[in-house]
Amino acid sequence: MHYKKIVKGTFIDRPNRFIAHVEINGLIETVHVKNTGRCKELLIPGCTVVMEDFRKRLGFESRKTQFDLIAVYKKTDKDEILINMDSQLPNKVVLEWLEQFPPQEAYDFIKPEYTYGNSRVDFYMEKKTSVGIKKYLMEVKGCTLEQNGIGYFPDAPTERGVKHLHELAAACKKGYKCFLAFVIQIPGVTQVLPNKKTHPEFAHALEMAKAAGVEILYLQCNVKEDEVVII
């Protein structure tokens, strides 16, 4: 996924879930935060943040804010790492990834935002086989929380996430092949563990889903200021 135009600034504060104040080229700007999660470990006053710039872009003249905050530089013991925190990115990069499978592995049909039962699942896929059509369901979660080189999910309680795991587990029993895909929006992180301290119910539901046959995918990303791709 590519961002058309980016600009960097210095994070000041976050009055609510939706906006932040950022200093850009000496001016204090109100920007839209593309992640309604807490992100307290990332958005620290004084840190460098990356925004997509919509100024003078055709079709976006009526926007209330001219910038989307999409990424942040997090200081570590050795250096800084760039973490993409755009909550809309995971599904977009997964769709790009699915559509680029080699022919021998490609799905014959991919449907984003698929209605399954009383819920929406991120992706429904099909493959034609010698014995019929194989059906797949995939739920996608973005990981932006890192501690000591390990990713954790969620960064805040997610009853919706627990519900999704129960639905995938039930779908496995009906013959679907089901995946939970963690899109790791942090360079160098290869695994994601359940954040038991923040939401023990999610950790329990994850174990139950795995026992039911849900396959867990850890999708590492190449993270740049203006682009993120699954590697």
What are these regions (language model features)?
Residues 9, 121-154, 168:
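Conserved catalytic cores of phosphodiester-cleaving nucleases, focusing on short active-site segments
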Residues 16-21:
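Short aromatic-glycine-enriched beta-strand elements
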Residues 27-42:
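Beta-strand/loop nucleic-acid-binding surfaces
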Residues 40, 79-112:
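Acidic-basic catalytic patches of nuclease active cores, encompassing PD-(D/E)XK
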Residues 45-60, 220-221:
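Flexible glycine-rich surface loops and low-complexity tracts that mediate binding to linear polymers
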Residues 185-231:
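Domain-level recognition of nuclease-like catalytic cores that cleave nucleotide substrates
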